[in-house]
């Protein structure tokens, strides 16, 4: 009896070795049905029922583990994994035990899918998927397969979400462009007819194109005069309406369609004006500069970023807060209307609208340093859009640099998906704008030569002021932060119907933008005269040409701009139904002066000796003096319509000047 027991133990030992070798073999290849049957047959040779049950259970377990579950997982469309898994079980698994295990796994997949679909955010879906893997998988190999499936789902959902976001952005852009076209057509119903006429001219031979375009302009001119005769209430005289019709030929004029939306969310948008040098070579002095307009809703937060450009900010309306990171030091400033502040290139900064009711409007003038006329934003934080630049580094680099696991980083980078301008709670706004003891520069002296804080234009006396208008300007000698950029910032408020100028800048070229109201602009330009034939006629040598200046006209509305080159005489007329508010950024500002060509004071023509004026005009001295010395006002004057309508006794009825300090935004 002892011998039989010994033989049985030996047999069981050999069988265990056989089963172990079979397990290793089966783990390395797809499960073989014949081997499974052989495994069960060997179990049947054992003497006790308990041994047989345990042996068969081991065979079943190996069978379950060696099913290739990847063939039941749809890697491309996780939404249909449940149905496809069940269908493949019915098609490919014939044995009842195989069907049982296959259906059980499919049920788990279906439950996972149901819970997965309840989550809308890819990051939440990913986390839920990982929990399922940890809960139901015990074998490392299966755990890895499950986690890989989670990764594939996560990446696919991210791509789908990004695609939806981009489609929504395009839809918003198209609606915005369509709305702008509708507004433009309402403002200028004859523009389409003029553009059609010009397109027909372009189809003609080159010799005939110029005459054809002149005919188009003449037709528009006649339409404009006719419109004034039929509707005498229409703003401006006939000659001012002509400028509106010729704006498409004006390289200095930028309408609102010249603004492209850089970022747009429900809480605000950032727009950038067309590249100056890309518009015309006449604007080559501005090839390194760009104009950006920002608008943010109450309690909005603009994500941290840095630019590869130096920036000068002007607060047009609202109340904000600016945080700038200089190396390892944070500087914090409250911003008010009229504040000017510089953000050096590479400085990480972020903005907050700290007002509960009013929108924040900021104009930024950028001096590019990497690529002329081109700049980029770099966001350290974000999610889907903007994508944080940190996410472009490999996970090994990020783990080493931040000493943080990839799973945690993925959770951080995947959360924000509302865009560049987002809404913050009032509690968050209070926390962001409170007097932070760690910030050594909170409310440092405002303005001044040595300050890095904001300089407020309205803290100084107006540069020019009378009942027809006010002007304020900060120059490099006033604010040290403007010196190495050689820029100036200018704001003017012109009362309804009044005008500023004519005048010219001695050195500075300025980008002038309408913040409120409407402006009729006229400028004398010697560069455009050759394009229309000039008065000289023929192609003669440059120094032999007759001197001729083209009259450049433009009708500017809110958010539209015009470039005034140095030396070019210009005049701005407030032509709308409200006061005109202008702001301007000027380059080459050091030692620049405005030379006015009319008025009792600051009039350069009055400084020319009477004999010289008499010789220059070839007219009697008395007539010259009467022509140039009759204006009692300076800088700001009654406009053309006021001049025609007002008698000397009615000057007291002039609309009173509304202070520029009363203006609160676009």
From Swiss-Prot:
Gene Ontology molecular function: nutrient reservoir activity
Region of interest (Disordered), residue spans: 161-191, 219-254, 629-655
Domain of life: Eukaryota
Keyword Plastid annotated: no
Span of domain Cupin type-1: 271-410, 455-625
Localization of this protein: Secreted
Annotated signal peptide: 1-27
Keywords carried by this UniProt record: Antibiotic, Antimicrobial, Fungicide, Plant defense, Secreted, Seed storage protein, Signal, Storage protein
Cellular component annotations (GO), alphabetically ordered: extracellular region
Protein name: Vicilin-like antimicrobial peptides 2-1
Organism for this UniProt entry: Macadamia integrifolia
